[in-house]
Amino acid sequence: MKFIVLIVIVFSHFSLFAQKDTVESKVYVLNNLNVEKQDTRERRQIAEGSGAVLSYMEWHTTTIDPGKSPHASHRHDDEEYIIIKEGQLKVTINDNSKVLGPGSFALFIPGDMHGFVNAGDTKATYYVFRYRSKAPVDLERAKKAGGSFMVDWNDIVFKPHDKGGIRNFFERPTAMLKRFEMHVTTLNAGIKSHDPHTHGAEEIVLLVKGNTEMQIAQSHQKADGGDLIYLSSNILHAIQNIGNEPSIYFAFQWQ
């Protein structure tokens, strides 16, 4: 009996630890984040922990001066992608380089060499999303889907609709994710994108511009340009534009 009680206590301890390690579904306000000044960059830590699909995920922003790099080109066993907030960033994946501007995206599968240089004459800021999956890494699946890749904001067609419009970036598997889908929504002033709903996929909403309110479960939280919203699997949510101008935001889901 004492042995069973001990097992229950130990299990409860690790369950509590796991819960603490889970990334919280909420609005992460960019202006509230501490700025860590390093030799080559400024860094703002957004969140770090685990989720339903990922054993580890970490998000931060990096800001670098013109002509500077945050670090030397490198490779690692995690998967990673970036979204450029402002400035002009030269992104290199293996032997392929491209200068990307605000709203552009790049993903690096495990093992691929990648690096960044500020190619403009003003500061460049970008979001970094680094993660590893609970399931085994599938490099073959990633390579069949196209491997590491970049998406230039200027190449994405805007498709208007009655609530605003959409830019479809991609939907594909990666080495760590069976499904990764990304689009950008333009939501007209004063309206909801949709009614409160749930889905199995985890989701991040990244505000490019505007003033919104996101319902997360039973709470309502404001999110403005630059802020990030994390929505865990099957949590009730809905977003509304509470400003006087269109809001623009990334929405990306993974499973």
Residue positions per predicted region:
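Glycine- and acidic-residue-biased ligand/ion/polar-headgroup-sensing regions
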Residues: 77-79, 83-89, 200-213, 217
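Structural motif
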Residues: 68, 88, 113, 123, ...
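A short, N-terminal "cap"/entry segment at the start of jelly-roll beta-barrel domains
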Residues: 18-57, 121, 125, 134-179
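Ligand-binding loop in jelly-roll beta-barrel domains
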Residues: 110-136, 233-255
